[in-house]
């Protein structure tokens, strides 16, 4: 009886240790890889922000990434109610753009935030972009967040579109 209990406890501890190591490796991989995740199929983009987010801003961001070799299935400029009402759900094959409320962000300095879901076996699954209310007009902000939704991470080089500080980013892009 005690032997079975000890083996069960040892198996549980081993599983928890394995999961922890796996998570640590994924975090390290994301931290040290410029584009850790790829879309297997081109995503569609849905404007869940609403009519205040002009198609011009979305098109500018999409065009930027398409010129860099990314593929987008299509852009839906009108909110799709069945998808957009699920603010905290990341939908498969979709990049949704939302108006972010102050509570969404961890700091008053954060203007945009992208939550993405990826799998080691399938790559990028989906992403939600949150732009702080009224800040979508800030140069390159939506393009930067769309970069995260497409699988890119930050680059700490002044002028790079993926620089983490808005004031230090520009419309330059290269793979470091």
What do these predicted ranges mean?
Residues 152-175:
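Post-HEXXH active-site segment of zinc metalloproteases
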